[in-house]
Amino acid sequence: MEKALVLRFLAGVYYIKDLETQIILEAKKRGKLKTLVIKTTQKENSSASDFIIKVGDIVLYELSCDTYLIQSILPRKNELKRPNVANIDQVLLVFSLVKPNFQFLLLDKFLLILEQQKLDVVLVFSKIDLLEPENFKTMQQQLSYYQKFQHFYYINSKQKIGIDALKHIFANQITVLAGQTGVGKSTLLKVLIPDAQLKTQEISESLGRGKHTTKNAQLYDFNGGFIVDTPGFSKLDLTTFSPRTLKNFYPDFLEHVCDCFFGESCFHLQEEKCGVKKALENGQILPSRYQNYVIFCEEIKNQPKY
């Protein structure tokens, strides 16, 4: 059997790229995967998602009766469920500064979930041309806090501002484009890969939210690596977190745990002599960052299983 990379799934057909010949083929899934040997760094037990072929999967296939059949999925190093992608090197997290308006709450929630997945993140802030200079300067000052643990870029895709500085990050990487609906992911991809034939859509003025442009995850060759364009989404949940573990996915909080009286057992909420709260008072932690942490704690506690 031969190895291939899954580029796209559409109407029951998998578009795969043979790793040796680099030829793109149309294939179908075998009725029941013959050899399921999936293990990821994120889990040990099998789940229903193990039986779903994802964009980014490395698969074994063979020709049978004039049809290419995917027989098995090779081990994944990581995976996401929404978007449904596997074997990711990094996530390019795109936010617009306006239309839709930027939310620190959404940024912190995305970062929290991706930190749990142990994925490298690059932040991209789009539509910088739609902000007044003073407002843009204020946003830059607020967002500068995140520079100590994230790489990020400011861009204007339509005028191609900041695009050249961004291109190098894609080399030899599988990069997922992710972010809220309508932030400009498809516009950015169209600038990077003009022949991707994507349809960009205007923001719905009445709802203040974007219309979905990308219907299925798809992997594109670019600059020696691959870019995965994914459907936009605006709802994220914290069902994989517990009140006890949430704090462990804040790298900026972990810097101050050594100053907590209760050490790693501190929840950084009501406890006295808390190093994180002291850092907050001293201006070392962004107030909105801590406030969002408290909101997430409450959200998790109010989930049915808790």
Curated annotation (Swiss-Prot):
Main location, first listed in the record: cytoplasm
The keyword Cytoplasm appears for this protein: yes
Binding site for Zn(2+): C260, C266, H268, C274
Biological-process GO terms, alphabetical: ribosomal small subunit biogenesis
Residues annotated as binding GTP: S126, K127, I128, D129, G179, Q180, T181, G182, V183, G184, K185, S186, T187
UniProt keyword list: Cytoplasm, GTP-binding, Hydrolase, Metal-binding, Nucleotide-binding, Ribosome biogenesis, RNA-binding, rRNA-binding, Zinc
Note accompanying the cofactor annotation: Binds 1 zinc ion per subunit.
EC number assigned by the record: 3.6.1.-
Cellular location(s): Cytoplasm
Record Pfam families: RsgA_GTPase (PF03193)
Cofactor: Zn(2+)
Example of a GO MF term: metal ion binding
Domain CP-type G: 77-236
GO CC terms in record: cytoplasm
Keyword Cell membrane: no
NCBIfam families in UniProt: ribosome small subunit-dependent GTPase A
Family under the similarity heading: Belongs to the TRAFAC class YlqF/YawG GTPase family. RsgA subfamily.
Name used for this protein in its record: Small ribosomal subunit biogenesis GTPase RsgA
